[in-house]
Amino acid sequence: MPKMKTDKGVAKRFKKTANGFKRKQAHLRHILTKKSTKRKRHLRAKCQVAKSDVPAIARQLPYA
């Protein structure tokens, strides 16, 4: 049986942790002048993937 392929786009965006997957938050790439410093600071923090999305990500990362 051939090896399963890892989805490289998903591999670059998500990292496996003991409790699931961590990811970077969105809305921090452009149009930043209208966003407050506080909002941008909070968006820098990593967050957990929702429990309902974990099975889909796990399927795309078979060796994570």
Swiss-Prot record:
Q: Which cysteines are joined by disulfide bonds?
A: none
Answer whether the UniProt record assigns the keyword Ribonucleoprotein to this protein: yes
A Gene Ontology biological process in which this protein takes part is: translation
Supply the SUPFAM superfamilies for this chain. Answer: L35p-like
Among InterPro entries, the record links this protein to: Ribosomal_bL35, Ribosomal_bL35-like, Ribosomal_bL35_CS, Ribosomal_bL35_sf
Q: Which superkingdom, per the lineage?
A: Bacteria
One Gene Ontology cellular component: cytosolic large ribosomal subunit
Ribosomal protein: present as a keyword of the record?
A: yes
Question: What's a single GO MF annotation on this record?
Answer: structural constituent of ribosome
Please provide the record's keywords in A-Z order: Ribonucleoprotein, Ribosomal protein
PROSITE patterns per UniProt: RIBOSOMAL_L35
Q: Which family does it belong to?
A: Belongs to the bacterial ribosomal protein bL35 family.
Q: Protein name, please? A: Large ribosomal subunit protein bL35
